[in-house]
């Protein structure tokens, strides 16, 4: 479920040495499955362990995960990185905002997952996003742009060279193309 690098494990052991005996760490997700999802790590004293917690044993400590957060922490990783600017703990949880879907899930769910987990994070740097409206019987993913993408002069390039290429590569034989149904209104909100 969660991978913790050797460097991060050593860091946690060092931090926990100053805590009361039996204290572990807790890894959690606030607002899991939403765009506002945030992950965190905290101390977990023995009296804060819940009966439905999942205990993940590591070298010298355990990581406690509440039942609600668990599916959103699949494939999560924690690392302790040191560079010339200092050290920092990093927590990456690719499924925090949206639960990973199985490979046999309906096509619309799998496409939506890719949009939320891979495409929208890229568009977010421009204040934009896309939403899946439907997948037609012909296999065309009908999309609607929002935020900074609405009215952007680069939207056709983003759609054809970026999004369509990525989706067709990921869903060969299932998707045949993409179509934009956005009523584009160029304004101050538009990226370009």
Curated annotation (Swiss-Prot):
Cofactor(s) required, per the database record: [4Fe-4S] cluster
Coiled-coil parts of chain: none
Annotated GO MF terms: 4 iron, 4 sulfur cluster binding; iron ion binding
Residues at which [4Fe-4S] cluster binds: 149, 152
SUPFAM superfamilies: Fe-S cluster assembly (FSCA) domain-like (SSF117916), HesB-like domain (SSF89360)
Origin: domain of life: Bacteria
rRNA-binding as UniProt keyword: no
BP GO terms, sorted: iron-sulfur cluster assembly; protein maturation
Entry note: cofactor: Binds 1 [4Fe-4S] cluster per subunit. The cluster is presumably bound at the interface of two monomers.
Pfam families on file: Fe-S_biosyn (PF01521), NifU (PF01106)
UniProt keyword Metal-binding present: yes
UniProt keyword terms in alphabetical order: 4Fe-4S, Iron, Iron-sulfur, Metal-binding
Known partners and oligomeric status: Homodimer.
Function per UniProt: Involved in iron-sulfur cluster biogenesis. Binds a 4Fe-4S cluster, can transfer this cluster to apoproteins, and thereby intervenes in the maturation of Fe/S proteins. Could also act as a scaffold/chaperone for damaged Fe/S proteins.
Family: Belongs to the NfuA family.
Descriptive protein name: Fe/S biogenesis protein NfuA
Lineage summary: Bacteria, Pseudomonadati, Pseudomonadota, Gammaproteobacteria, Alteromonadales
């Amino acid at each position: 479920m969660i991978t913790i690098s050797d460097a991060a494990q050593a860091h946690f052991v060092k931090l926990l040495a100053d805590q009361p005996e039996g204290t572990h760490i807790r890894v959690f997700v606030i607002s899991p499955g939403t765009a506002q999802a945030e992950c965190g790590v905290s101390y977990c004293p023995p009296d804060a362990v819940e009966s439905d917690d999942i205990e993940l044993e590591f070298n010298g400590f355990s990581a406690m995960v509440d039942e609600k957060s668990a599916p959103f922490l699949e494939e999560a990783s924690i690392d302790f990185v040191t560079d010339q600017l200092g050290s920092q703990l990093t927590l990456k949880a690719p499924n925090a905002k949206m639960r990973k879907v199985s490979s046999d899930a309906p096509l619309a769910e799998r496409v939506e997952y890719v949009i939320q987990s891979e495409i929208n994070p890229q568009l977010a740097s421009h204040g934009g996003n896309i939403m899946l409206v439907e997948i037609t019987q012909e296999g065309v993913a009908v999309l609607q742009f929002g935020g900074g993408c609405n009215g952007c002069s680069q939207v056709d390039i983003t759609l054809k060279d970026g999004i369509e290429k990525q989706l067709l590569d990921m869903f060969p034989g299932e998707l045949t193309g993409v179509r934009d149904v956005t009523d584009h209104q160029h304004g101050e909100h538009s990226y370009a």
